[in-house]
Amino acid sequence: MKNKPDDRRDNVDKIQYNITKTIQNCELADEMIAKTDDEKTKKTLIEKNQRRREALDGMREEIKDEARDKKNGYM
């Protein structure tokens, strides 16, 4: 079986999609935090959003790297 060549042309788009969805999930969780009285649920959502924000930092760095590599022709 032949290996597929590494096709990174749409990586920037994929990462941007993931960033957008992660931000939407954070916003939805923030709404739930504001509406719920359940402290356990609030704590869980706050922790999850913290992990999402950390992931966003990583994705933003990754998208910069991919955009630079795309501009340079993926050499």
UniProtKB/Swiss-Prot annotation:
Signal peptide span: none
Coiled coil ranges (UniProt) are none
Annotated region (Disordered) at 48-75
The domain of life for this entry's organism is Bacteria
The record's InterPro entries line, in alphabetical order, gives: SASP_thioredoxin-like
Name the Pfam families for this protein: Tlp
Family, per the entry? Belongs to the Tlp family.
Q: What NCBIfam families would the database entry show?
A: SASP_tlp
Q: What is this protein called?
A: Protein Tlp homolog
Originating species: Clostridium botulinum (strain Loch Maree / Type A3)
| Lineage, broadest ranks | Bacteria, Bacillati, Bacillota, Clostridia, Eubacteriales
